[in-house]
Amino acid sequence: MFKKTLIAAAIVVGSAAPAFADVVISPNDNTFVTTSLASVTKQPVLDFSTAQQNLTLNFSEVGDLKNNGFIVLEIQGEGQFNDAEIRQWLSNGFWRRPFTGLLVNPNDHGNFANSGEVNDVRKFFKIISDGTQLTIVHTIDSNGKRLRLALASDVEETINFADAEVELKLNLANQAFKLTSGSQGTVALTAGALWNASYTADPVATKPLFKLGKLFQLSLTNAGKATALVSEGFLKLNIGDANISATDFAITNVTTNQTIQRDKVNLTLTGDVSAFKKDANGNLVNKAGASIGWKAAADGQSATAVLGAGNMAGGVQNALAAFGTLYVAADNTVPVPAVNFNVKAEIQGDSQATYNYFKDELADLFILTRDGMKFDTITTGTTSANLIHIRDVSNILPTEGGKIFVTITEYADHAANGRGEGTVLVTRKALSVTLPSGGAVTLKPADVAADVGASITAGRQARLVFEVETNQGEVAVKKSNAEGVDIQNGTRGTAPLVDFTL
Protein backbone atom coordinates (compact mmCIF):
# COMPACT_ATOMS: atom_id res chain seq x y z
CA MET A 1 0.00 0.00 0.00
CA PHE A 2 2.81 2.40 0.93
CA LYS A 3 4.63 1.63 -2.26
CA LYS A 4 1.53 2.33 -4.35
CA THR A 5 1.04 5.67 -2.60
CA LEU A 6 4.60 6.78 -3.42
CA ILE A 7 4.17 5.85 -7.05
CA ALA A 8 0.91 7.76 -7.29
CA ALA A 9 2.51 10.82 -5.66
CA ALA A 10 5.40 10.67 -8.09
CA ILE A 11 3.00 10.64 -11.02
CA VAL A 12 1.16 13.69 -9.68
CA VAL A 13 4.41 15.63 -9.14
CA GLY A 14 5.71 14.69 -12.59
CA SER A 15 2.54 15.81 -14.33
CA ALA A 16 2.64 19.19 -12.59
CA ALA A 17 6.25 19.96 -13.59
CA PRO A 18 6.69 22.51 -16.39
CA ALA A 19 7.79 21.26 -19.78
CA PHE A 20 10.66 23.77 -20.25
CA ALA A 21 10.73 23.15 -23.98
CA ASP A 22 12.47 25.55 -26.34
CA VAL A 23 10.41 27.73 -28.62
CA VAL A 24 10.81 26.59 -32.22
CA ILE A 25 11.25 29.61 -34.49
CA SER A 26 10.87 29.42 -38.23
CA PRO A 27 12.24 30.09 -40.69
CA ASN A 28 15.71 29.19 -39.46
CA ASP A 29 17.41 28.29 -42.74
CA ASN A 30 18.83 30.06 -45.77
CA THR A 31 15.39 31.40 -46.70
CA PHE A 32 15.59 33.81 -43.75
CA VAL A 33 15.69 37.42 -44.98
CA THR A 34 17.96 39.77 -43.06
CA THR A 35 17.21 43.45 -43.65
CA SER A 36 20.46 45.23 -44.55
CA LEU A 37 20.64 48.90 -43.57
CA ALA A 38 23.42 51.46 -43.87
CA SER A 39 25.15 52.10 -40.57
CA VAL A 40 25.64 55.72 -41.69
CA THR A 41 21.89 56.29 -41.75
CA LYS A 42 21.17 59.36 -39.65
CA GLN A 43 19.67 58.62 -36.25
CA PRO A 44 16.32 60.41 -36.77
CA VAL A 45 15.82 58.20 -39.84
CA LEU A 46 17.09 54.95 -38.32
CA ASP A 47 14.70 55.51 -35.40
CA PHE A 48 11.97 54.05 -37.61
CA SER A 49 13.06 50.77 -39.20
CA THR A 50 11.04 47.80 -40.47
CA ALA A 51 12.13 44.16 -40.57
CA GLN A 52 11.31 42.17 -43.71
CA GLN A 53 11.21 38.67 -42.21
CA ASN A 54 8.05 37.25 -40.64
CA LEU A 55 8.45 34.72 -37.81
CA THR A 56 6.44 31.75 -36.61
CA LEU A 57 6.77 30.74 -32.95
CA ASN A 58 5.91 27.11 -32.26
CA PHE A 59 5.19 26.07 -28.66
CA SER A 60 5.71 22.34 -28.94
CA GLU A 61 4.55 21.20 -25.49
CA VAL A 62 1.16 21.37 -23.83
CA GLY A 63 1.52 23.85 -20.99
CA ASP A 64 4.16 26.06 -22.62
CA LEU A 65 1.61 28.88 -22.53
CA LYS A 66 0.37 29.68 -19.01
CA ASN A 67 -2.67 31.61 -17.83
CA ASN A 68 -1.74 35.28 -17.33
CA GLY A 69 1.78 34.60 -18.56
CA PHE A 70 3.65 36.32 -21.37
CA ILE A 71 5.19 35.66 -24.71
CA VAL A 72 8.42 37.62 -24.46
CA LEU A 73 10.30 39.13 -27.41
CA GLU A 74 13.67 40.70 -26.62
CA ILE A 75 16.02 42.60 -28.90
CA GLN A 76 19.58 41.31 -29.09
CA GLY A 77 21.93 44.03 -30.28
CA GLU A 78 21.73 47.79 -30.48
CA GLY A 79 18.04 48.53 -30.88
CA GLN A 80 14.72 49.23 -29.18
CA PHE A 81 10.99 48.84 -29.81
CA ASN A 82 8.96 51.93 -30.73
CA ASP A 83 5.89 52.02 -28.48
CA ALA A 84 3.42 53.79 -30.79
CA GLU A 85 4.32 51.66 -33.80
CA ILE A 86 4.17 48.42 -31.79
CA ARG A 87 0.72 49.41 -30.52
CA GLN A 88 -0.43 50.03 -34.08
CA TRP A 89 0.98 46.67 -35.19
CA LEU A 90 -0.84 44.83 -32.37
CA SER A 91 -4.19 46.52 -33.13
CA ASN A 92 -6.91 45.50 -35.55
CA GLY A 93 -7.66 48.99 -36.86
CA PHE A 94 -11.40 48.99 -36.30
CA TRP A 95 -13.78 47.18 -33.95
CA ARG A 96 -14.21 43.51 -35.05
CA ARG A 97 -11.83 43.49 -37.98
CA PRO A 98 -9.27 40.65 -37.97
CA PHE A 99 -5.78 41.31 -36.66
CA THR A 100 -3.19 41.38 -39.46
CA GLY A 101 0.11 41.90 -37.65
CA LEU A 102 -0.17 38.83 -35.43
CA LEU A 103 -1.89 35.54 -36.30
CA VAL A 104 -2.53 32.49 -34.13
CA ASN A 105 -3.08 28.78 -34.61
CA PRO A 106 -4.03 26.36 -31.80
CA ASN A 107 -2.94 23.54 -34.12
CA ASP A 108 -5.72 21.23 -32.94
CA HIS A 109 -4.53 18.20 -34.94
CA GLY A 110 -4.00 20.35 -38.01
CA ASN A 111 -7.59 21.52 -38.23
CA PHE A 112 -6.84 25.25 -38.20
CA ALA A 113 -5.01 27.71 -40.43
CA ASN A 114 -3.28 30.76 -39.00
CA SER A 115 -5.97 33.26 -38.10
CA GLY A 116 -6.28 36.88 -37.09
CA GLU A 117 -9.96 36.65 -36.25
CA VAL A 118 -10.74 38.35 -32.95
CA ASN A 119 -12.25 35.23 -31.37
CA ASP A 120 -9.14 33.19 -32.24
CA VAL A 121 -6.66 35.80 -31.06
CA ARG A 122 -8.62 36.22 -27.83
CA LYS A 123 -7.99 32.54 -27.02
CA PHE A 124 -4.26 33.32 -26.84
CA PHE A 125 -3.99 36.93 -25.68
CA LYS A 126 -5.67 39.50 -23.53
CA ILE A 127 -7.34 42.19 -25.62
CA ILE A 128 -8.45 45.70 -24.71
CA SER A 129 -10.62 48.22 -26.55
CA ASP A 130 -10.31 51.99 -26.82
CA GLY A 131 -13.81 52.26 -28.28
CA THR A 132 -12.58 52.21 -31.86
CA GLN A 133 -10.15 49.35 -32.19
CA LEU A 134 -8.92 46.30 -30.30
CA THR A 135 -5.32 45.94 -29.15
CA ILE A 136 -3.40 42.98 -27.74
CA VAL A 137 -2.31 43.86 -24.21
CA HIS A 138 1.44 44.36 -24.20
CA THR A 139 4.25 46.10 -22.32
CA ILE A 140 7.64 47.40 -23.46
CA ASP A 141 10.31 47.48 -20.73
CA SER A 142 14.04 46.84 -20.14
CA ASN A 143 14.97 50.18 -21.70
CA GLY A 144 12.83 49.51 -24.73
CA LYS A 145 14.45 46.17 -25.56
CA ARG A 146 11.77 43.76 -24.27
CA LEU A 147 8.19 43.36 -25.53
CA ARG A 148 5.78 41.28 -23.42
CA LEU A 149 2.54 40.02 -24.97
CA ALA A 150 -0.02 39.24 -22.24
CA LEU A 151 -1.47 35.73 -22.49
CA ALA A 152 -5.17 35.19 -21.80
CA SER A 153 -6.30 34.25 -18.30
CA ASP A 154 -7.70 30.96 -19.63
CA VAL A 155 -5.13 30.12 -22.32
CA GLU A 156 -4.38 26.75 -20.71
CA GLU A 157 -8.01 25.72 -21.23
CA THR A 158 -8.58 27.21 -24.69
CA ILE A 159 -5.17 26.23 -26.16
CA ASN A 160 -4.69 22.81 -24.63
CA PHE A 161 -2.75 21.36 -27.55
CA ALA A 162 0.89 20.81 -28.46
CA ASP A 163 2.45 22.83 -31.28
CA ALA A 164 0.35 25.96 -30.83
CA GLU A 165 1.68 28.69 -33.07
CA VAL A 166 1.89 32.47 -33.12
CA GLU A 167 2.87 34.14 -36.39
CA LEU A 168 4.54 37.54 -36.14
CA LYS A 169 4.01 39.52 -39.34
CA LEU A 170 7.02 41.75 -38.73
CA ASN A 171 6.89 43.15 -42.25
CA LEU A 172 3.64 44.81 -41.14
CA ALA A 173 5.25 46.19 -37.98
CA ASN A 174 6.00 49.37 -39.88
CA GLN A 175 8.83 51.43 -38.39
CA ALA A 176 8.57 49.49 -35.12
CA PHE A 177 12.33 49.19 -34.51
CA LYS A 178 14.68 51.94 -33.38
CA LEU A 179 18.22 51.05 -34.41
CA THR A 180 21.46 52.85 -33.56
CA SER A 181 23.23 55.01 -36.14
CA GLY A 182 26.91 54.27 -36.52
CA SER A 183 26.69 50.80 -35.04
CA GLN A 184 28.05 47.80 -36.91
CA GLY A 185 26.82 44.23 -36.74
CA THR A 186 23.43 42.60 -36.41
CA VAL A 187 20.19 42.86 -34.46
CA ALA A 188 18.12 39.77 -33.66
CA LEU A 189 15.24 38.76 -31.39
CA THR A 190 14.81 36.09 -28.76
CA ALA A 191 11.36 34.64 -28.17
CA GLY A 192 10.11 32.65 -25.20
CA ALA A 193 7.16 32.14 -22.83
CA LEU A 194 7.36 33.47 -19.25
CA TRP A 195 5.22 32.80 -16.18
CA ASN A 196 5.70 33.27 -12.47
CA ALA A 197 9.44 34.11 -12.60
CA SER A 198 10.21 31.12 -14.83
CA TYR A 199 10.42 30.46 -18.53
CA THR A 200 7.90 27.80 -19.46
CA ALA A 201 9.28 27.82 -23.00
CA ASP A 202 12.94 28.74 -23.05
CA PRO A 203 13.80 31.69 -25.29
CA VAL A 204 15.50 31.02 -28.59
CA ALA A 205 17.29 33.53 -30.81
CA THR A 206 16.28 34.26 -34.36
CA LYS A 207 18.72 34.72 -37.17
CA PRO A 208 19.64 38.42 -37.57
CA LEU A 209 16.63 40.56 -38.44
CA PHE A 210 18.88 43.51 -39.28
CA LYS A 211 22.45 43.91 -40.44
CA LEU A 212 24.06 47.34 -40.35
CA GLY A 213 26.92 47.89 -42.74
CA LYS A 214 27.80 49.57 -46.02
CA LEU A 215 25.53 51.87 -47.98
CA PHE A 216 26.96 51.08 -51.40
CA GLN A 217 29.89 49.23 -52.90
CA LEU A 218 32.02 49.65 -56.02
CA SER A 219 33.08 46.58 -57.98
CA LEU A 220 34.65 45.46 -61.24
CA THR A 221 35.77 42.24 -62.87
CA ASN A 222 38.89 43.41 -64.68
CA ALA A 223 40.77 46.70 -64.66
CA GLY A 224 41.23 48.61 -67.88
CA LYS A 225 44.84 47.95 -68.90
CA ALA A 226 47.20 49.38 -71.49
CA THR A 227 50.92 49.87 -71.98
CA ALA A 228 52.46 53.11 -73.24
CA LEU A 229 55.07 52.34 -75.88
CA VAL A 230 58.57 53.67 -75.36
CA SER A 231 59.11 53.37 -79.12
CA GLU A 232 56.44 56.07 -79.49
CA GLY A 233 57.82 58.26 -76.74
CA PHE A 234 54.98 56.93 -74.53
CA LEU A 235 52.51 58.93 -76.64
CA LYS A 236 50.69 55.84 -77.92
CA LEU A 237 49.44 52.60 -76.44
CA ASN A 238 49.91 48.94 -77.25
CA ILE A 239 46.14 48.58 -77.82
CA GLY A 240 46.23 50.90 -80.84
CA ASP A 241 43.64 53.57 -81.46
CA ALA A 242 41.04 52.19 -79.05
CA ASN A 243 39.38 52.89 -75.72
CA ILE A 244 40.87 51.61 -72.50
CA SER A 245 37.97 49.76 -70.91
CA ALA A 246 37.43 48.25 -67.48
CA THR A 247 35.12 45.22 -67.34
CA ASP A 248 31.90 45.27 -65.32
CA PHE A 249 32.61 48.45 -63.37
CA ALA A 250 29.50 48.96 -61.23
CA ILE A 251 28.05 50.40 -58.03
CA THR A 252 25.59 48.45 -55.87
CA ASN A 253 23.17 49.71 -53.25
CA VAL A 254 23.85 46.96 -50.69
CA THR A 255 20.94 47.87 -48.42
CA THR A 256 17.67 45.95 -48.61
CA ASN A 257 15.19 48.76 -49.05
CA GLN A 258 16.92 52.12 -48.60
CA THR A 259 17.00 54.56 -51.50
CA ILE A 260 20.07 56.45 -52.72
CA GLN A 261 19.75 59.69 -54.67
CA ARG A 262 22.22 59.20 -57.49
CA ASP A 263 22.88 62.92 -57.92
CA LYS A 264 24.20 63.04 -54.34
CA VAL A 265 26.94 60.48 -55.03
CA ASN A 266 30.21 61.99 -56.26
CA LEU A 267 32.98 60.03 -57.98
CA THR A 268 36.68 60.87 -57.97
CA LEU A 269 39.28 59.27 -60.24
CA THR A 270 42.78 59.72 -58.79
CA GLY A 271 45.74 59.71 -61.17
CA ASP A 272 47.34 61.78 -63.92
CA VAL A 273 44.71 62.25 -66.66
CA SER A 274 46.71 64.79 -68.70
CA ALA A 275 47.26 62.45 -71.65
CA PHE A 276 43.62 61.47 -72.16
CA LYS A 277 41.39 63.11 -74.73
CA LYS A 278 39.12 65.92 -73.50
CA ASP A 279 36.66 68.35 -74.99
CA ALA A 280 36.98 72.13 -74.76
CA ASN A 281 35.46 72.12 -71.27
CA GLY A 282 37.85 69.58 -69.83
CA ASN A 283 35.42 66.66 -70.00
CA LEU A 284 37.08 63.35 -70.80
CA VAL A 285 35.70 61.73 -73.95
CA ASN A 286 35.89 58.32 -75.58
CA LYS A 287 37.10 57.48 -79.07
CA ALA A 288 33.72 58.49 -80.54
CA GLY A 289 34.05 61.92 -78.93
CA ALA A 290 31.22 61.35 -76.46
CA SER A 291 31.60 62.52 -72.89
CA ILE A 292 32.20 59.63 -70.47
CA GLY A 293 31.20 61.64 -67.39
CA TRP A 294 34.62 62.50 -65.97
CA LYS A 295 35.79 66.12 -65.78
CA ALA A 296 39.52 66.67 -65.40
CA ALA A 297 40.82 68.78 -62.53
CA ALA A 298 42.75 71.93 -63.40
CA ASP A 299 46.06 70.32 -62.44
CA GLY A 300 45.30 67.18 -64.44
CA GLN A 301 45.96 64.90 -61.48
CA SER A 302 42.38 63.70 -61.01
CA ALA A 303 38.89 63.78 -62.48
CA THR A 304 35.45 64.03 -60.90
CA ALA A 305 31.89 63.06 -61.82
CA VAL A 306 28.36 62.82 -60.46
CA LEU A 307 26.87 59.32 -60.43
CA GLY A 308 23.75 60.41 -62.33
CA ALA A 309 20.08 61.31 -62.01
CA GLY A 310 17.18 59.55 -60.35
CA ASN A 311 17.19 57.08 -57.47
CA MET A 312 18.87 53.75 -56.88
CA ALA A 313 16.69 51.35 -54.90
CA GLY A 314 17.93 48.89 -52.32
CA GLY A 315 19.66 45.84 -53.76
CA VAL A 316 20.05 47.42 -57.21
CA GLN A 317 23.33 47.42 -59.13
CA ASN A 318 24.05 50.17 -61.66
CA ALA A 319 26.56 49.47 -64.44
CA LEU A 320 29.12 52.27 -64.86
CA ALA A 321 30.49 51.31 -68.27
CA ALA A 322 31.06 54.91 -69.40
CA PHE A 323 33.03 55.76 -66.26
CA GLY A 324 35.14 52.65 -66.91
CA THR A 325 36.51 54.11 -70.15
CA LEU A 326 39.53 56.26 -71.04
CA TYR A 327 40.95 57.18 -74.45
CA VAL A 328 44.33 58.37 -75.71
CA ALA A 329 43.93 60.15 -79.04
CA ALA A 330 45.98 59.15 -82.07
CA ASP A 331 47.44 62.68 -82.18
CA ASN A 332 48.24 62.77 -78.45
CA THR A 333 51.24 64.94 -77.51
CA VAL A 334 51.46 64.23 -73.77
CA PRO A 335 53.44 61.16 -72.59
CA VAL A 336 51.13 58.62 -70.97
CA PRO A 337 52.25 58.00 -67.38
CA ALA A 338 52.71 54.67 -65.67
CA VAL A 339 49.98 54.89 -63.05
CA ASN A 340 47.26 52.92 -61.30
CA PHE A 341 44.00 54.86 -61.19
CA ASN A 342 41.88 54.53 -58.05
CA VAL A 343 38.22 55.52 -57.87
CA LYS A 344 36.21 56.76 -54.91
CA ALA A 345 32.44 57.15 -54.54
CA GLU A 346 31.19 59.31 -51.69
CA ILE A 347 28.03 60.90 -50.39
CA GLN A 348 28.18 64.01 -48.21
CA GLY A 349 26.12 64.12 -45.05
CA ASP A 350 25.07 67.72 -45.58
CA SER A 351 23.82 67.12 -49.12
CA GLN A 352 20.75 65.07 -48.13
CA ALA A 353 18.72 64.15 -45.05
CA THR A 354 19.05 60.37 -44.88
CA TYR A 355 22.75 59.50 -44.56
CA ASN A 356 25.87 60.72 -42.87
CA TYR A 357 29.11 60.82 -44.87
CA PHE A 358 30.01 57.54 -46.55
CA LYS A 359 32.59 56.49 -49.12
CA ASP A 360 33.74 53.36 -50.88
CA GLU A 361 36.99 53.08 -52.78
CA LEU A 362 38.24 50.76 -55.47
CA ALA A 363 41.89 50.36 -56.36
CA ASP A 364 43.13 49.87 -59.90
CA LEU A 365 40.16 50.83 -62.04
CA PHE A 366 42.76 51.47 -64.74
CA ILE A 367 46.34 50.18 -64.81
CA LEU A 368 48.70 51.92 -67.21
CA THR A 369 52.29 50.80 -67.59
CA ARG A 370 55.19 51.70 -69.81
CA ASP A 371 57.09 49.04 -71.69
CA GLY A 372 60.80 48.58 -71.24
CA MET A 373 63.35 46.09 -70.00
CA LYS A 374 63.42 44.05 -66.82
CA PHE A 375 66.38 42.54 -65.04
CA ASP A 376 67.22 41.34 -61.57
CA THR A 377 70.32 40.97 -59.46
CA ILE A 378 70.99 39.41 -56.07
CA THR A 379 73.12 41.11 -53.47
CA THR A 380 74.10 40.38 -49.88
CA GLY A 381 72.64 43.16 -47.79
CA THR A 382 73.28 46.85 -48.18
CA THR A 383 76.95 46.27 -47.35
CA SER A 384 77.47 45.21 -50.95
CA ALA A 385 79.93 47.21 -52.99
CA ASN A 386 78.05 46.38 -56.19
CA LEU A 387 77.50 49.06 -58.79
CA ILE A 388 74.58 48.77 -61.20
CA HIS A 389 75.04 50.59 -64.51
CA ILE A 390 71.94 51.18 -66.65
CA ARG A 391 72.17 52.80 -70.07
CA ASP A 392 69.56 53.86 -72.63
CA VAL A 393 70.51 53.38 -76.26
CA SER A 394 67.09 54.08 -77.76
CA ASN A 395 67.57 57.86 -77.74
CA ILE A 396 63.77 58.30 -77.87
CA LEU A 397 62.84 58.73 -74.20
CA PRO A 398 60.80 61.82 -73.28
CA THR A 399 62.43 64.82 -71.65
CA GLU A 400 61.65 63.61 -68.12
CA GLY A 401 63.44 60.35 -68.91
CA GLY A 402 62.43 56.78 -68.24
CA LYS A 403 61.29 55.78 -64.77
CA ILE A 404 63.10 53.03 -62.90
CA PHE A 405 60.95 50.78 -60.71
CA VAL A 406 62.30 48.31 -58.20
CA THR A 407 60.84 45.36 -56.29
CA ILE A 408 62.94 44.12 -53.36
CA THR A 409 62.67 40.69 -51.75
CA GLU A 410 64.77 39.81 -48.70
CA TYR A 411 65.52 36.19 -47.81
CA ALA A 412 65.72 34.82 -44.28
CA ASP A 413 69.12 33.85 -42.93
CA HIS A 414 70.09 30.33 -43.97
CA ALA A 415 73.23 28.25 -44.26
CA ALA A 416 74.47 26.24 -47.22
CA ASN A 417 71.96 23.56 -48.17
CA GLY A 418 69.45 25.35 -45.96
CA ARG A 419 66.34 27.30 -46.79
CA GLY A 420 65.14 30.83 -46.15
CA GLU A 421 61.70 32.30 -46.74
CA GLY A 422 61.42 35.39 -48.91
CA THR A 423 59.80 38.61 -47.70
CA VAL A 424 58.78 41.30 -50.18
CA LEU A 425 59.91 44.65 -48.78
CA VAL A 426 58.65 46.91 -51.58
CA THR A 427 56.75 46.27 -54.80
CA ARG A 428 57.39 48.24 -57.95
CA LYS A 429 58.37 51.52 -56.34
CA ALA A 430 59.80 54.25 -58.53
CA LEU A 431 63.28 55.58 -57.80
CA SER A 432 63.77 59.30 -57.54
CA VAL A 433 66.28 59.20 -60.39
CA THR A 434 65.20 58.61 -64.00
CA LEU A 435 67.12 57.31 -66.99
CA PRO A 436 67.87 60.12 -69.47
CA SER A 437 67.38 59.50 -73.17
CA GLY A 438 70.67 58.21 -74.54
CA GLY A 439 72.15 58.55 -71.05
CA ALA A 440 73.11 56.41 -68.08
CA VAL A 441 72.38 55.88 -64.39
CA THR A 442 74.65 54.28 -61.80
CA LEU A 443 73.05 52.77 -58.68
CA LYS A 444 74.22 51.28 -55.39
CA PRO A 445 72.01 48.69 -53.66
CA ALA A 446 72.15 50.58 -50.36
CA ASP A 447 71.05 53.81 -52.03
CA VAL A 448 68.28 52.03 -53.94
CA ALA A 449 66.89 50.55 -50.71
CA ALA A 450 67.05 53.90 -48.93
CA ASP A 451 65.38 55.68 -51.87
CA VAL A 452 62.30 53.46 -51.68
CA GLY A 453 62.19 53.22 -47.88
CA ALA A 454 63.28 49.59 -47.59
CA SER A 455 65.55 48.27 -44.85
CA ILE A 456 67.60 45.25 -45.88
CA THR A 457 69.22 43.33 -43.04
CA ALA A 458 73.02 43.43 -43.22
CA GLY A 459 74.42 40.19 -44.58
CA ARG A 460 71.06 38.91 -45.88
CA GLN A 461 70.47 37.95 -49.49
CA ALA A 462 68.16 40.31 -51.32
CA ARG A 463 66.78 40.18 -54.85
CA LEU A 464 66.30 43.48 -56.66
CA VAL A 465 64.03 43.37 -59.72
CA PHE A 466 64.36 46.46 -61.91
CA GLU A 467 61.87 47.64 -64.52
CA VAL A 468 63.27 50.39 -66.70
CA GLU A 469 61.25 52.46 -69.15
CA THR A 470 63.40 51.84 -72.19
CA ASN A 471 62.94 49.30 -74.93
CA GLN A 472 66.59 49.48 -75.91
CA GLY A 473 68.90 49.45 -72.94
CA GLU A 474 72.05 47.95 -71.52
CA VAL A 475 72.88 46.88 -67.99
CA ALA A 476 76.16 46.00 -66.35
CA VAL A 477 76.63 45.01 -62.71
CA LYS A 478 80.04 45.30 -61.09
CA LYS A 479 80.24 42.57 -58.44
CA SER A 480 82.72 43.10 -55.61
CA ASN A 481 83.82 41.18 -52.55
CA ALA A 482 83.75 44.11 -50.19
CA GLU A 483 82.23 43.87 -46.74
CA GLY A 484 79.45 41.70 -48.13
CA VAL A 485 79.70 38.66 -50.36
CA ASP A 486 77.62 38.90 -53.53
CA ILE A 487 76.12 36.02 -55.40
CA GLN A 488 76.08 35.44 -59.14
CA ASN A 489 72.92 33.48 -59.87
CA GLY A 490 71.12 31.91 -62.75
CA THR A 491 67.47 30.90 -62.49
CA ARG A 492 65.75 28.43 -64.74
CA GLY A 493 62.61 29.57 -66.52
CA THR A 494 62.82 33.31 -65.81
CA ALA A 495 62.33 34.46 -69.40
CA PRO A 496 58.74 35.64 -68.88
CA LEU A 497 59.75 37.45 -65.68
CA VAL A 498 62.98 39.25 -66.60
CA ASP A 499 65.01 39.75 -69.74
CA PHE A 500 68.23 38.65 -68.06
CA THR A 501 69.81 38.04 -64.66
CA LEU A 502 73.11 39.53 -63.51
Swiss-Prot record:
State what protein this is by name.
S-layer protein
Q: Where is the signal peptide?
A: 1-21
Tell what the record comments on domains: This S-layer protein is composed of two distinct structural domains: a larger mass trypsin-resistant N-terminal, containing the binding region for extracellular matrix proteins, and a smaller C-terminal domain with intermediate resistance to trypsin.
For the keyword Glycosyltransferase, the answer is no
Q: Supply the source organism for this entry.
A: Aeromonas salmonicida
Upon changing residue 35 to N, the result is: In strain: A450
Subunit comment for this entry?
Answer: Monomer. Forms oligomers at high protein or low salt concentrations.
Q: Its biological function?
A: S-layer protein. The S-layer is a paracrystalline mono-layered assembly of proteins which coats the surface of bacteria. This S-layer, also called A-layer, confers virulence to the bacterium infecting salmonid and non-salmonid fish. It binds specifically to laminin and fibronectin.
Chief location of this protein within or outside the cell: secreted
